[in-house]
Amino acid sequence: MNKFLLSFILLTSSCSTGNLKVIADLPKALNEASGIETNNHSDLIWMVNDGGNASKLFGLSSDGKIKKALKINAKNNDWEDLASDKEGNIYIGDFGNNANKRKNLAILKVSVDSLNNKGKINIERISFNYPNQNKFPPKKKHLYFDSEAFFHFNDSLYIFTKSRVKGDFGKTDLYRIPAKQGKHIAEHVSSFNSCPEIDCWITSADISDDGKKIVLLNSKSVWVFIDFKETDFFSGKAIEFPLNHNSQKESICFKNKNTLYISDEKAHGVDGNLYKLEIN
């Protein structure tokens, strides 16, 4: 967690949750929740923690109670987001890259059939690298290779980067890789820039079940994209939903086409909640 960002959030947070409705306080086991996902194959809300925590995939009820804690047979280098496909398989984004120097970026596929296992769960590793990174780390003006956001769509995984370039924090580059085991070079699709400030960092993403709406999360707002052409998700209309609440928001997913789940990390006893947001 970036100390500057934490200080900024603590100074600007309040007891009000703005446009967000609190559903539950997250349990202590998810104090550093970094990814959230739902799908039509389970009634549970799936969540993971940030890097440095146990390699576990948690299944929660809608009131925030842990119903499953699955042990994943892979290191949590820096797990940052969750996604799922129409078959119910879960994908874990192990691509957090604060220093822009990782050479082992990966997405871990957890089979839907293994979600009822009691022992350690094996995964399929989908490794990738960015086509335009050749130094690890690059110079400060080229720190564009961190990521905390992705989703699955039409047999591909779409990854949204997080800029660590001062004055360009709100920029995100969209990349695509095949959703299959192996080593891949990511394909650049397009870019979007919301604002230059640090609280515009993109920290999570999701796509609606019908594929007609995507959402990007930052500390202070949700960006909704509609009317786009095929998979150029930034080609349509972009609508910002201010949250009127600033915290370290780390994860977002669709509950249904007009309702979102959002979570934030607990810091100094503040936040660490599961929220609901209506965007219709």
Each language-model region and where it sits:
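Sequence/structural signature of beta-propeller domains
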Residues: 16-280
